[in-house]
Amino acid sequence: MAELQNDRFLRALLKEPVDQTPVWMMRQAGRYLPEYRATRKQAGSFMDLCRNKELACEVTLQPLERYPLDAAILFSDILTIPDAMGLELRFQTGEGPIFDKPIKSMSDAKKLFVPDMASELGYVMDAVSTIRKALDGRVPLIGFSGSPWTLATYMVEGGSSKTFAKIKAMMYDQPATLHHILDVLADSVIAYLNAQIEAGAQAVQIFDTWGGVLTPRDYKEFSLNYMAKIVDGLKRENDGRKVPVILFTKGGGQWLESMAETGCDALGLDWTTDIDDARARVGDKVALQGNMDPSVLYASPDRIREEVATILEKYGQGTGHVFNLGHGIHPEIDPEHAGAFIKAVTELSPKYHK
């Protein structure tokens, strides 16, 4: 593998000194880019795009051709694991992901298995190694997975949900069933992320998109415990270099201390937590990633720059901050505005690293 030319993203995650604050965007390869929309059309369906290593590589690199980003993130979907378990994933226009075989009972849950990474999910690893080769050491490649709780919400609800009624009913009425599902998912995520690391991912992120819908007690029992199990099972070094792990619970600002205890290297923050408060609470233990509201990108480039300046000032001097949005970039954002965001971080952050 080619020598890494820009490692400031990895260094910041490990709280090592950097020359400026590294920056990337969740969903940076996505629908806001016209070139992504063209490749997506060429692929046919969304999952066909994920399964074609050349096209997945192409869309992963597209934002790097436009912007001076400090990391690339694998183009894939969090639902690849449940799909490989035989739940038959499809995407319905306007509705999002749908599973034709949702899990309703313990007998359904008992049929779940840890997918074979080479045969069932080999297309993901092929994409990782193809992208890593194409990057040729420009920037590190991030691998990722959904958290067990977040994956389970889709598997039990049969798709997206606003109320999470089915999974919460299972959680309160059949907790043993839900724990069984989460256990199999945690083992699957460990195998999945380790396979991505073997294939060339240089950092990994666990996306707990729906952890924030839980009570504090339920969050610990049904989400955090399983993420801690994953962190514990991950390969933390490859090619003689540490592989940092980022945990991101959307809406998880109240639980940062507990999250920092898992042994992860960094915590993702959404925009509902002040980064200065987060640093005061857990900055001695972990790096922080975030946390501009993605909706700021609808505003003018001057307003975007102001917001970037505020967040940099709130975090303050020194390393341990990776600049990002507080969640994925919205599909309607003007690519020029995303560019103004990246430019502001690269121009305004060096003074915090002197």
Swiss-Prot record:
This is Uroporphyrinogen decarboxylase. Keywords: Cytoplasm, Decarboxylase, Lyase, Porphyrin biosynthesis. It is an enzyme of class 4 (lyase). Pathway: Porphyrin-containing compound metabolism; protoporphyrin-IX biosynthesis; coproporphyrinogen-III from 5-aminolevulinate: step 4/4. Pfam families: URO-D. HAMAP family: URO_D (MF_00218). It comes from the Bacteria. It is found in: Cytoplasm. It comes from Hydrogenovibrio crunogenus (strain DSM 25203 / XCL-2). Disulfide bonds: none annotated. Its EC number is 4.1.1.37. It catalyses: uroporphyrinogen III + 4 H(+) = coproporphyrinogen III + 4 CO2. Belongs to the uroporphyrinogen decarboxylase family. Substrate binds at R27, Q28, A29, G30, R31, D77, Y154, T209, H327. GO terms for molecular function: uroporphyrinogen decarboxylase activity. The record marks D77 as: Transition state stabilizer. GO terms for biological process: protoporphyrinogen IX biosynthetic process from glutamate. GO terms for cellular component: cytosol. Its main location: cytoplasm. Homodimer. Catalyzes the decarboxylation of four acetate groups of uroporphyrinogen-III to yield coproporphyrinogen-III.
